[in-house]
Amino acid sequence: MTKFSSFSLFFLIVGAYMTHVCFNMEIIGGKEVSPHSRPFMASIQYGGHHVCGGVLIDPQWVLTAAHCQYRFTKGQSPTVVLGAHSLSKNEASKQTLEIKKFIPFSRVTSDPQSNDIMLVKLQTAAKLNKHVKMLHIRSKTSLRSGTKCKVTGWGATDPDSLRPSDTLREVTVTVLSRKLCNSQSYYNGDPFITKDMVCAGDAKGQKDSCKGDSGGPLICKGVFHAIVSGGHECGVATKPGIYTLLTKKYQTWIKSNLVPPHTN
């Protein structure tokens, strides 16, 4: 895993830069989904432990958050688990695949908070079936304030707990304007929510993404619009979840890596 070790120092630096921000998201205030009803979901793991979420966008590619990589240390062999509902049960639908390489967005080094997106290439292609399916990126417009969206993940249901949920859960959040998110009473520019980011949460702070589900999808009206990135604390109304918006520049970058899809 030479590719993995070559990034270890960089992501330790990025990790230190992001320590004041909760960048390992989970689901707060949601409910368990029907088993295998979200067949595009991926669990990125090491040693059998869930680290981050992800989305299968091609049989050999998973989309996730770039900061997830710094959680691995030299010598570890991370894997991707597809077709799961329960993390602990021995489900016949599960496929555990080795990771060939991580490809963070090219400008993540210069601006890690606003370019928190990464491709994960699998060693072998996933076998698509009713439990393992791709989620295509079709987002063409920005998200308007007030839009209702769903976030899915295996994160903890209690913001004070570090234990992930054993089963896949989902919560509905509301998109907030960048002006509000960057205001003094919200994030006050730390981090600054750019046009490549969006924040979403709940007016009462009871619904949020928080620890353990970074890289999972934000789906609005059936369209895959963004991935979970971070946020201060968990379930706090004035510190809503932060998401990397799948803007044109990211979609172009993704396509450039996937086409031709299996020759790298």
From Swiss-Prot:
Sorted UniProt keywords: Disulfide bond, Hydrolase, Protease, Secreted, Serine protease, Signal, Zymogen
Say where the protein is mainly found: secreted
Annotated Gene Ontology cellular components are: extracellular space
Q: In which tissues is it expressed?
A: Expressed in lung, spleen, thymus and peripheral blood leukocytes.
Which residue range or ranges hold the Peptidase S1 domain? 27-259
Q: Signal sequence span per UniProt?
A: 1-24
GO terms for MF: serine-type endopeptidase activity; serine-type peptidase activity
Please report the name of this protein according to its UniProt entry: Granzyme K
Q: Which family does it belong to?
A: Belongs to the peptidase S1 family. Granzyme subfamily.
- Gene coding for it: GZMK
Highest taxon of the lineage: Eukaryota
Q: List the disulfide bonds.
A: C52-C68, C149-C220, C181-C199, C210-C234
Task: Work out whether the entry's keyword set contains Magnesium.
Answer: no
Q: What class of enzyme is it?
A: hydrolase
